[in-house]
């Protein structure tokens, strides 16, 4: 299941990386490729994501739903 979320003021898609199944935040706008911890992960120019395993506990706590409600990303990782 994919979910649109807010992280660092940007709307990203909380999903699983297609190649490994790892939870990640996928870009929704090409301008997001410059965000800290964003990685190029594919053969297409728009395949960038931030792997949740690379975020600190503080950064994980900053991921919210589109209405600003905090998300328990640790719990959500199993549902994505």
Regions found by a protein language model. Name each.
Residues 1-2, 73-80:
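Short intrinsically disordered terminal tails
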Residues 15-66:
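Acidic, low-complexity, intrinsically disordered interaction modules
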Residues 2-4, 26:
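Residue-level detector of beta-strand face positions
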């Amino acid at each position: 299941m994919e979910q649109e979320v807010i992280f660092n003021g940007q709307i990203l898609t909380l999903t699983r990386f297609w190649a490994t199944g790892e939870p990640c935040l996928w870009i929704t706008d090409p301008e997001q490729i410059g965000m800290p911890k964003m990685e190029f992960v594919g053969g297409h120019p728009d395949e960038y994501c931030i792997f949740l395993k690379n975020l600190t506990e503080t950064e994980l706590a900053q991921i919210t739903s589109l209405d600003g409600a905090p998300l328990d990303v640790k719990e959500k990782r199993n549902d994505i």
